[in-house]
């Protein structure tokens, strides 16, 4: 049972990090890959959910993850 809770906790952490973008794909190119490119002003993409909408789900998952860690350690 404890190993299942540990596995579920790790999965939730990975899901939260992918959702918030820390493990997601970067939108910027690596520096120095193309020396002939010109610098232009790029507008941010308007796709995806806003951070206000994601805040509720992320806080819920954070508290659920914390509770699972406490149950695992007890």
From Swiss-Prot:
Signal peptide start-end: 1-23
Keywords: Cell membrane, Glycoprotein, GPI-anchor, Lipoprotein, Membrane, Signal
Lipid attachment in record (GPI-anchor amidated serine): 47
Localisation per UniProt entry: Cell membrane
Domain of life, per lineage: Eukaryota
Stored Pfam families: CD52
Annotated glycan sites: 36
Region spans: Disordered: 26-47
Residue span(s) of the pro-peptide: 48-74
Keyword Oxidoreductase attributed: no
Topology within the bilayer: Lipid-anchor; GPI-anchor
Main subcellular localisation: membrane
BP GO annotations: response to bacterium
Its biological purpose: May play a role in carrying and orienting carbohydrate, as well as having a more specific role.
Designated name of the protein: CAMPATH-1 antigen
Gene (UniProt): Cd52
């Amino acid at each position: 049972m404890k190993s299942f809770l540990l596995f579920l906790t790790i999965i939730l952490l990975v899901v939260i990090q992918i959702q918030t973008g820390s493990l997601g794909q970067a939108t910027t190119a690596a520096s120095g890959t193309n020396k002939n490119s010109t610098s232009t002003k790029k507008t941010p993409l308007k796709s995806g959910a806003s951070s206000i909408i994601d805040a509720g789900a992320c806080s819920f998952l954070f508290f659920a993850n914390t509770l699972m860690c406490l149950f695992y350690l007890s």
